[in-house]
Amino acid sequence: MSESAELTELYSAIEETTRVVGAPCRRDTVRPILTAYEDVIAQSVISFRVQTGTSDAGDLDCRFTLLPKDMDPYATALSNGLTAKTDHPVGSLLEEVHRQFPVDCYGIDFGAVGGFKKAWSFFRPDSLQSASDLAALPSMPSGVSENLGLFDRYGMTDTVSVVGFDYAKRSVNLYFTGASPESFEPRGIQAILRECGLPEPSDELLRFGEEAFAIYVTLSWDSQKIERVTYSVNTPDPMALPVRIDTRIEQLVKDAPLGSAGHRYVYGVTATPKGEYHKIQKYFQWQSRVEKMLTADAG
């Protein structure tokens, strides 16, 4: 199959998935992104994501992971005019992480409406990194340093598997895949959210958290507080999870194209100052190498 045919097939899958979940699909937004990353799409893992209750709820997000470590995904976005260059620290953080840490591969997120949004740096499961070391980077939000005590208390500090860079919202995600068992128990979830100044978790989140394998936190440069905490679950059957399934999530699960990945999903519940929202990531294109990384690819 030629590269152009491959892109046409992928665009058709994105377009069909947006139709299924009732989201727009802007060809003039999506096609330039596919073209910019054309050389690495065949070897990547591809997934589609929807969420509820946020400013992004009307968009379909697409994710490419397993991008090669010698590729700077943000530089590619800049050179292809997919995002504007910025003097904000978010614009230099990925390069700092790449220069000082053993990044194994990269990823990107883009919306069928919103365009290029995020990049990701993945560490190998046998080479998890320290939040203390990441906090020392010049461009890292100071909130990482301010919350090292919390990370220590719940066995999270030395278990960072992914760093996410949200260029659209100017925030950072730290993914922890080795937190203490207590972190997933109802008391632990309540304590973590309380320390973050977030509302008490719903009973739904407490039940869901007991099945989770990873936690990630969102921080920005505007505050030293953790803005959001997300618990993630790997599942072949999201409909069986102990949560109320939103209509758009159900549509993605039941009606969107399967691709080569079959029935593979990551479901997340996020706690915010304004309440909780849900998200789901449906894998479309699979690579066998991702099996060991799946615990790090947490929605």
Swiss-Prot record:
Keywords: Antibiotic biosynthesis, Prenyltransferase, Transferase. Pfam families: PTase_Orf2 (PF11468). GO terms for biological process: phenazine biosynthetic process. Does not require magnesium or any other divalent metal ions for activity. The keyword Transferase applies. Disruption phenotype: Mutant can form only nonprenylated phenazine 1-carboxylic acid. One of its GO terms (molecular function) is prenyltransferase activity. InterPro entries: Aro_prenylTrfase, Prenyltransferase_CloQ, PrenylTrfase-like_sf. Involved in the biosynthesis of prenylated phenazines. Specific for both dimethylallyl diphosphate and dihydro-PCA. Belongs to the aromatic prenyltransferase family. This is 5,10-dihydrophenazine-1-carboxylate 9-dimethylallyltransferase. It comes from Streptomyces anulatus. The gene is ppzP.
